[in-house]
Amino acid sequence: MYIRGSKWNMQKKRRRVNPFGVIVVVLLIGVLIYFDRTVASTIPALFVSTPTPTRAPESFITEAQKLEADGKYAQAIQTYNQAVLADPRNPASYMALARLNIYTNNYAEAIKNAENALMLNNNNDTALALLGWAYGLSGDYIQAESKINQALAINKDNAAAYAYLTEVYVYEMQAGQGVLEILDLAREASRTAVALAPNTLETHRSRGLLLNWTANYEEAVVEFEAAVKINPNIADLHMELGKNYVATLEYDKAIDEYGKAVSLNPNDPTPSTLISRVYFTNGDYAKAIQYAESALALEPSDPVLHGNLGLIFWRNKQYLDAVDQLRLAVRGGTTPEGVAVTGLELDYNRIGEFYQVYGLALAKTNQCGEALQIAQAVATGLRNDDNAQFNAQEVIIMCEALAKAGIADLPTATPFDNQELTQTATVSPTP
């Protein structure tokens, strides 16, 4: 039904489409599409950081190599570590790090980096040789020989491995270890390194160490001079050259080399200690004390450094100062700055010298109660050392003289018999 004129009419009139409106809409859509594709794509999103270009791993390696060539080893190590982060599957970065770790005396880190290289390729003879070298410098001679021999089994022409093996044999001999024919083995390994690569740093270094061990000091000087010429940025090489200059009585040259080691590694007390000993030998005790104190400031908990300073004080007739330092070396204790020092076990060589001079300094300052205990320890513990026996007896003579004069610090001042001395319990240093 259709009701004409009713307001309820269900059929509505259709509006005519405006053609101009359609054109405007189409144009607007086109503009939006153009804006989205050309303009909006260049506008950075809000609150999103601007992306930075990724640096190529090779650029880190190039930079690290330049730093290494300039002797900036700490910075080179840092940059090689960045190279590792950028490309953890490049064994060359790990091996470069291991070598620099060795040059800077960080042997534990060298072992870790050499092992990382081997995780990528367990037949890498260069990494195995470096690992063995690092073990040898750490004092683990069994592992050192094993790893280096593995490297040589893979590559029998690896000259550096023979050089490292020579070094390890020398360290074993210095420690009183190794097989009976170890010196012959060291000589054979050294000759092979020379035959394969006579002009490398590794060959000169290892041969210098071997010649020093066999007391061929002038020849050792030649080898270490050649090594330093190849790489003047390794502190250990300068110290080894300095030691051989001392052996050939070229003290000024020795001090110069030790000074270079100080410059290269200012946080290591060893070169300053070596300088102090040269001045001590020359009788320049003021300079010897200066350098010994500089070394001690770097490692105040080291009993050997306290002993070294104590010996110089003794020779400079500063007896009370000598007692203070040697007591820390022998018995241990706490420095005035509150640093704990652990005493050294009595032994031959330099530690035995600390004990002997400590006893003499105690007697010289009328502290015979303790002096006689130390003399007893020396007489019993160093009975195969004639100088030690003489010094122990000298302590007794000094204290006898004080006792006869009535000024010894003993409860009962009586003469002392050497037989009685040998029956007393040995004194052990207390921590």
Regions found by a protein language model. Name each.
Residues 1-55, 141, 146-170, 175, ...:
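Long, contiguous interaction/recruitment modules in multidomain scaffold/adaptor proteins
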Residues 19, 45-48, 335-431:
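Terminal, low-structured helical/coil segments at or just beyond the last alpha-helical repeat
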Residues 53-106, 137, 171-179, 202, ...:
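Alpha-helical segment of the N-proximal tetratricopeptide repeat
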Residues 55, 89, 123, 157, ...:
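Structural signature of alpha-solenoid helical repeat junctions
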Residues 57, 91-92, 125-129, 159-160, ...:
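Helix-start (N-cap) detector for alpha-helical repeat units in TPR-like alpha-solenoids
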Residues 71-78, 104-116, 138-150, 173-192, ...:
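Structural signature of tandem alpha-helical TPR/SEL1-like repeats
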Residues 86, 120, 154, 196, ...:
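Structural marker of alpha-solenoid helical repeat scaffolds
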